[in-house]
Amino acid sequence: LQERLNAEVVLTRTDDTFISLEERTALANEHQADVFVSIHANSSRIRSVSGVETYYLNFATTLDAQEVAARENVSTGRNIRELPDLVKSITKADKSAESRELANILQKRLYRSAQRLFPETKNRGVRTAPFVVLIGADMPSVLAEVGFVSNPRDEKLLKRVDSRKRLAEALYAGIEGYMKSLGSMEVQASNRAKGSAP
């Protein structure tokens, strides 16, 4: 991203040091980031569950999404019902729509890349859930689940340097695709404002 898009990249951490979910979002806001991508490896009680999925902030629409959010949010020590800022941040409709767009583009790239690594990779799609790490973000924000560490095949792939590099390239391509889509959206909005057809 830094080299190819001349973008400033801010990592919330570069090692295994724990940084709270809220601090990660605050750091992105402090740096006035254009996008916030939280990268995770998923887990399931059912070891056969595998694949890639991307989330953006909203209420969970499936039991799976609720369970993933509950696991990811456990480090906060709070229950989702105890997060008063959740409803307020979800009502930022413009960020929700932008986050959905980012999630869709990122998911397509992630799935394509993961499928090249392992053709049987499941596309678990774009989902919504109330992730603490996404609450309060002032920019489009998503959580990308790049595989399941509870699945032996996914775990094996995630341990390989070449696999992680490919997934990183897919994340780059997704962010690049999203940034390019912003340009076309701005042109369309400008044309609509001028009264001309897009």
Question: What residue spans do the PLM features occupy?
Answer:
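Active-site-proximal helix/loop segments of hydrolytic enzymes
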Residues: 1-198
